[in-house]
């Protein structure tokens, strides 16, 4: 017996020494008994040795199979290890690849692996769940595959452009190789490498093609079983066994019987023709089926195992008498599994709805129905266990409908009393002779509904149509709150009424009442009778409503939080409707600014929003100083967006962990409540400009002048640093350019920078009364430019006519007279008014520019001398021997003892 049957061929022994191929698993049994299985004719057959191409390609395909298995289980570490081995194996097969070309299956795995890694990289949630090794391997492998694929860029591009064609070519090549290997000596290469790679299903109709491929494989296997042992099917059978990952005995793998007679050759040729014909028939049949499927429409993905007809769950056994006790018992059974792990919340809601239907069909009374509906609404709220997750649209609509149905029932049956203080043991659900008592709190349901609505608005893209659709639901929310308010006014306690009033206030305070505003602009005499009747039918104005609700809370509330929120909302509403003095007085009388730092964050956000609205209201009234003071704290911090609850800053995100960030995001106000930050900053900067520019001109020579607004000075310094100044584009650049013009007393240029088309679109048109605001701004710019002009050029004039000033700044003469008189009274301008000639006579008491410089130099020299003397005393051992209150101590030769600064007392001689 030849040693070949036990040791294998020479080429195989060499490849096994290299350690690069997979080690074959020995089959149970002794190799020595293997020849007994062979016939006498097969002992003389020609031994066929596998080529180097087959061995190299088999090694590549085995590694590819391992990589794909690792991809399925998301084992990136294994993918990295096998990819490195794959690169080494490809390098050893380089000589074969240079002759044959890059195999398609190799290009496919490179493209698929790169796409797979990109998907993992983009999946942020999946990356967080990865362990440390997989995350590190993902980063490393992604870099390696991107670098490695540069050499195969053209091949990968061709494959991605037509992946189906490449897959068909592989299949055809596989068939040709498997058929060619059955001949006697026609092809020495034997099996093609593509035979070891599974065909990748197409993106469309995956399941259909997969089943058809399995049917083809079954038919091929049946054909091979019908063939005799002495035909060329040995090679194809071994190929199929290798594709299935089964290692066979080397002796049986490489044995092959060669046809010896012409009859055998003809029989083999005939069988090959029959096999090719069968394959052609199957292929044509498959194409016909695909055409029929395509005519029927696209394939639809369905969930396996889900029945098409979903049966309703059975609540009670057949023949069970439906009574109050049975229904309550079933309700308790459903509620017992509530919140447990593995509970289907949607099914629980369906069971409760079915229970309501059963109770109504059996006329069990409204008491049972009300109790079940309370639990349905509570189950809807508990559908999402995560606090940050908001309700789905269908669940939200179901919740609104359930609350409306519950309110209809409670309003229609006045004998039903609900409350949290009612114990379950003392409930009365079926005794209609007495008032029905049900445990539950309608106020809690409405508050939770309001919170869910806020959560929906927080998690919806504010610039999408979906946000607008959700915002339309606020009308239903407000209607439900109003119904509950009327219900609680009749049957609720004082605390409950205060809470529902606050909910009504929170949905009213930020809305501008345009109808009431129009009625204020139009006098009653000018409106027709129909318009007056329509105004009466519309109900009370928002101002009257806010006054009534807030006053009740002021008088009845016992908690500081509800009263504080009501006061802030009332102030906000006053400021929004330009009632400055009412808003200011209410803020000052409440003393909220003294202890607001002790309030919880949502109340602090409401306080900040109220102060901002108060400042904007003062600006609209022309009170620039009050506006600046109200906005100073918010704008000077540089965190206006965060303080107003309109977003989180990137720099602050690094200071808090993930849980704190989630809590902060839940505190954000919805987008429709936002205050325009650009408008806010513009109001602040313009107010600062109107205050700061005249002050800078009046104290130009004062080295110790204070800054009114640091942010405004910062913007001025930024503008001065620009090497090339073009026309202003942003809002800040417009304000800086206007400030420079106001410094020169050029009010027209300042006006053109503040009020133009660009600034109107960004800021001024956003005000309810935009024309009034623009008129006020022009007036303020003229007045402050006049003050700046007098401060800057007072040293130039001996006297100046007020008529000239009136013409220069287009102000009427009484206004100019009033401004100059105030400046003289406040000792800002050293001048006097000559009434007969209507002129301003300058007194020249202020130093000139040269004198100011000399005074500054003298002051600096004096401070330098004092510092030098103090240093000298310190070196001589004097400790604090010179004090600021001891003026001219050295100049008058008053002695100082060198003992800690104790002044020597001169002895007085008595005469």
UniProtKB/Swiss-Prot annotation:
Source organism, top-level taxon: Eukaryota
SMART domains for this protein: PINT (SM00088)
Chief place where the protein resides: cytoplasm
InterPro entries cross-referenced by the UniProt entry: EIF3C, EIF3C_N_dom, PCI_dom, WH-like_DNA-bd_sf, WH_DNA-bd_sf
UniProt biased composition (Polar residues): 155-165, 520-529
GO CC annotation: eukaryotic 43S preinitiation complex; eukaryotic 48S preinitiation complex; eukaryotic translation initiation factor 3 complex; eukaryotic translation initiation factor 3 complex, eIF3m
Segments for region (Disordered): 1-44, 154-299, 520-540, 883-911
Keywords of this entry: Acetylation, Cytoplasm, Initiation factor, Phosphoprotein, Protein biosynthesis
SUPFAM superfamilies named among the record's database cross-references: Winged helix' DNA-binding domain (SSF46785)
Start-end of Acidic residues biased regions: 166-190, 216-230
Protein purpose: Component of the eukaryotic translation initiation factor 3 (eIF-3) complex, which is required for several steps in the initiation of protein synthesis. The eIF-3 complex associates with the 40S ribosome and facilitates the recruitment of eIF-1, eIF-1A, eIF-2:GTP:methionyl-tRNAi and eIF-5 to form the 43S pre-initiation complex (43S PIC). The eIF-3 complex stimulates mRNA recruitment to the 43S PIC and scanning of the mRNA for AUG recognition.
Family of this protein: Belongs to the eIF-3 subunit C family.
Subunit structure: Component of the eukaryotic translation initiation factor 3 (eIF-3) complex, which is composed of 13 subunits: EIF3A, EIF3B, EIF3C, EIF3D, EIF3E, EIF3F, EIF3G, EIF3H, EIF3I, EIF3J, EIF3K, EIF3L and EIF3M. The eIF-3 complex appears to include 3 stable modules: module A is composed of EIF3A, EIF3B, EIF3G and EIF3I; module B is composed of EIF3F, EIF3H, and EIF3M; and module C is composed of EIF3C, EIF3D, EIF3E, EIF3K and EIF3L. EIF3C of module C binds EIF3B of module A and EIF3H of module B, thereby linking the three modules. EIF3J is a labile subunit that binds to the eIF-3 complex via EIF3B.
Protein name, per record: Eukaryotic translation initiation factor 3 subunit C
Organism of derivation: Rattus norvegicus
């Amino acid at each position: 017996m030849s040693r070949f049957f036990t040791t294998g061929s020479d080429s195989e022994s060499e490849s096994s020494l290299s350690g690069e191929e997979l080690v074959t698993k020995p089959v149970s049994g002794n190799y020595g008994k293997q020849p007994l299985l062979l016939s006498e004719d097969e002992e003389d057959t020609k031994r066929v040795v596998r080529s180097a191409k087959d061995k190299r390609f088999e090694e590549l395909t085995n590694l590819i199979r391992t990589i794909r298995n690792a991809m399925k289980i998301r084992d990136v570490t294994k993918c990295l290890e096998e990819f490195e081995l794959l690169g080494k194996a490809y390098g050893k097969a380089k000589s074969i690849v240079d002759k044959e070309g890059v195999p398609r299956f190799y290009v496919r795995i490179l493209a698929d692996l790169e796409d797979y890694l990109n998907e993992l990289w983009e999946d942020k949630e999946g990356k967080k769940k990865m362990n440390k090794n997989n995350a590190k391997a993902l980063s490393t492998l992604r870099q390696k595959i991107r670098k490695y694929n540069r050499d195969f860029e053209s091949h990968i591009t061709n494959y991605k452009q037509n992946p189906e064609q490449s897959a068909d070519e592989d299949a055809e090549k596989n068939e040709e190789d498997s058929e060619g290997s059955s001949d006697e000596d026609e092809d020495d290469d034997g099996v093609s490498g593509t035979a070891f790679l599974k065909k990748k299903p197409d993106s469309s109709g995956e399941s259909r093609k997969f089943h058809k491929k399995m049917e083809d494989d079954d038919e091929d296997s049946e054909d091979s079983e019908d063939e005799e042992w002495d035909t060329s099917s040995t090679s194809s059978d071994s190929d199929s066994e290798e594709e299935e990952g089964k290692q066979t005995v080397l002796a049986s793998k490489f044995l092959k019987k060669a046809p010896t007679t012409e009859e055998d050759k003809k029989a083999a040729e005939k069988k090959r023709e029959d096999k090719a014909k069968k394959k052609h028939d199957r292929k044509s049949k498959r194409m016909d089926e695909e055409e029929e499927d395509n005519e029927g429409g696209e394939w639809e993905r369905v969930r396996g195992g889900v029945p098409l007809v979903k049966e309703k769950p059975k609540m009670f056994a057949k023949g069970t008498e439906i009574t109050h006790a049975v229904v309550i018992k079933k309700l308790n059974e459903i509620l017992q599994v509530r919140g447990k792990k593995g509970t289907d919340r949607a099914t629980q809601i369906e069971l409760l709805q079915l229970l309501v239907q059963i109770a109504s069909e059996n006329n069990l009374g409204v008491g049972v129905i009300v109790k079940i509906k309370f639990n349905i609404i509570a189950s809807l709220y508990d559908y999402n266990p995560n606090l940050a997750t908001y309700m789905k649209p269908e669940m939200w609509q179901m919740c609104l409908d359930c609350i409306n149905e519950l309110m209809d029932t409670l309003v229609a049956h006045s004998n039903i009393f609900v409350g949290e203080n009612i114990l379950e043991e003392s409930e009365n659900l079926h005794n209609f002779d007495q008032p029905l008592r049900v445990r539950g709190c309608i106020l809690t349901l409405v508050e939770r509904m309001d919170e869910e609505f806020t959560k929906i608005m927080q998690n919806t893209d504010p610039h999408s149509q979906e946000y607008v659709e959700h915002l339309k639901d606020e009308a239903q929310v407000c209607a439900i709150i109003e119904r509950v308010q009327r219900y609680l006014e009749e049957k609720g306690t004082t605390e409950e009424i205060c809470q529902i009033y606050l909910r009504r206030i929170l949905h009213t305070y930020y809305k501008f009442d345009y109808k009431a505003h129009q009625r204020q602009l139009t006098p009653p005499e000018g409106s027709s009778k129909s318009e007056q009747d329509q105004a009466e039918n519309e109900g009370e104005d928002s101002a009257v409503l806010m006054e009534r609700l807030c006053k009740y809370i002021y008088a009845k509330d016992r908690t500081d939080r509800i009263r504080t929120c009501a006061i802030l909302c009332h102030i906000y509403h006053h400021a929004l409707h330009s009632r400055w003095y009412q808003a200011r007085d209410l803020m000052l009388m409440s003393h909220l600014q003294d202890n607001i730092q002790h309030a919880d964050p949502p109340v602090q956000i409401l306080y900040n929003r109220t102060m901002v609205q108060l400042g904007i209201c003062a600006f609209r009234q022309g009170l620039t100083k009050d506006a600046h003071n109200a906005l100073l704290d918010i704008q000077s911090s540089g965190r206006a967006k965060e303080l107003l609850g309109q977003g989180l800053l990137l720099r602050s995100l690094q200071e808090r962990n993930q849980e704190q960030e989630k809590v902060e995001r839940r505190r954000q106000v919805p987008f429709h409540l936002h205050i325009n930050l650009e408008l806010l900053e513009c109001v602040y900067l313009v107010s600062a400009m109107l205050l700061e520019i005249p002050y800078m001109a009046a104290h130009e020579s004062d080295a110790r002048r204070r800054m009114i607004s640091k942010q405004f000075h910062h913007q001025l310094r930024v503008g001065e640093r620009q090497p090339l100044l073009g026309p202003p584009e942003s809002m800040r650049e417009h304000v800086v350019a206007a400030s420079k013009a106001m410094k020169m007393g050029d009010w027209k240029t300042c006006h053109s920078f503040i009020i133009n088309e660009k600034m109107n679109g960004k800021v001024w048109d956003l005000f309810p009364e935009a024309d009034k605001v623009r008129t006020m701004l022009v007036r303020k710019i003229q007045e402050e430019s006049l003050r700046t002009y007098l401060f800057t050029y007072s040293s130039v004039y001996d006297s100046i006519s007020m008529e000239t000033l009136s013409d220069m700044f287009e102000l009427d003469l009484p206004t100019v007279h009033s401004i100059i008189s105030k400046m003289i009274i406040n000792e800002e301008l050293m001048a006097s008014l000559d009434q007969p000639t209507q002129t301003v006579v300058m007194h020249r008491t202020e130093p000139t520019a040269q004198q100011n410089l000399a005074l500054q130099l003298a002051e600096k020299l004096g401070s330098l001398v004092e510092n030098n003397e103090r240093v000298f005393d310190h070196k001589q051992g004097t400790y604090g021997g010179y004090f600021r209150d001891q003026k001219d101590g050295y100049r008058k030769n008053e002695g100082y003892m060198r003992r800690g600064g104790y002044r020597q007392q001169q002895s007085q001689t008595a005469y």
